[in-house]
């Protein structure tokens, strides 16, 4: 019996580093194509999809500011521009396989994309378009995890999916510790007070205040995003 799809609108957050694949920098076209096909599987199941992508495959504001030459504020703005580069790349990949898309930026770049207007974003989603949100929140000192949570709340998402390289949340890094235990469900408070890395505290607090579930899953496993939407067990962890 096929699992019933319970969510109509979701926001999917990808890290910029994930786009680099096995490289430390840039965009791996094969990864981009894989992500696009995973998103298409959602759209084909009548799911409205928003996307936020980090910029760490190009530059991270915190890292750029560590040398003392570039101020943190400027470094963060540089990072925001990097997310727009990734957003345009994702737009191209999605449109290449037949999806209708829009990129909306929190910083005005009218020659490349729309400026972010939440009512317009919702209208695009209702018309079946995938909306990719770039430039973070438009403000320095906020992560793209926080931006993703904010956009998810603004557009009325049923949940936010953080697509990563692991299949959920663990009590310690599963890539370093063989005895790491997967946590299928945990509370917002547990995610905030523990040493478990899910999202930054601002993002988790925002999700908690607005009762927005956070799902962590493996983006590289084919069909996994759709499985998450169908609420199949064992392929993700949830904070709620």
From Swiss-Prot:
The keyword Electron transport does not apply. UMP binds at residues 55, 76, 137-144. Its EC number is 2.7.4.22. Pathway: Pyrimidine metabolism; CTP biosynthesis via de novo pathway; UDP from UMP (UMPK route): step 1/1. One of its GO terms (cellular component) is cytosol. The keyword Cytoplasm applies. Keywords: ATP-binding, Cytoplasm, Kinase, Nucleotide-binding, Pyrimidine biosynthesis, Transferase. It comes from the Bacteria. CDD domains: AAK_UMPK-PyrH-Ec (cd04254). Inhibited by UTP. SUPFAM superfamilies: Carbamate kinase-like. ATP binds at residues 13-16, 56, 60, 164, 170, 173. It is an enzyme of class 2 (transferase). It catalyses: UMP + ATP = UDP + ADP. HAMAP family: PyrH_B. Homohexamer. Catalyzes the reversible phosphorylation of UMP to UDP. This is Uridylate kinase.
């Amino acid at each position: 019996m096929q699992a019933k799809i319970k969510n109509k609108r979701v926001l999917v957050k990808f890290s910029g580093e994930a786009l680099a694949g096995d490289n430390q920098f840039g965009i791996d076209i094969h990864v981009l194509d894989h992500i696009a096909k995973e998103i298409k599987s959602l759209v084909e199941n009548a799911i409205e999809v928003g996307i936020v992508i980090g910029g760490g495959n190009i530059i991270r504001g915190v890292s750029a500011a560590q040398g003392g030459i570039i101020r943190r504020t400027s470094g963060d703005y540089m990072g925001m521009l990097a997310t727009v580069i990734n957003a345009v790349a994702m737009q191209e990949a999605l449109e290449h396989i037949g999806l209708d898309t829009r990129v909306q930026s929190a910083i005005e770049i009218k020659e490349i994309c729309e400026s972010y207007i939440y009512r317009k974003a919702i209208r695009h989603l209702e018309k079946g378009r995938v909306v990719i949100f770039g430039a973070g929140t438009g403000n320095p000192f906020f992560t793209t995890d926080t931006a993703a949570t904010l956009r998810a709340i603004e557009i009325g998402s049923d949940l936010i999916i953080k697509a990563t390289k692991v299949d959920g949340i663990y009590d310690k890094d599963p890539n370093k510790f063989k005895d790491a235990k997967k946590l299928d469900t945990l509370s917002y408070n547990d995610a905030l007070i523990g040493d478990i890395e899910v999202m930054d505290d601002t993002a988790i607090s925002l999700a908690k205040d607005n009762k927005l579930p956070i799902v962590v899953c493996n983006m590289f496993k084919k069909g996994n995003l759709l499985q998450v939407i169908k609420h199949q067990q064992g392929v993700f962890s949830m904070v709620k």
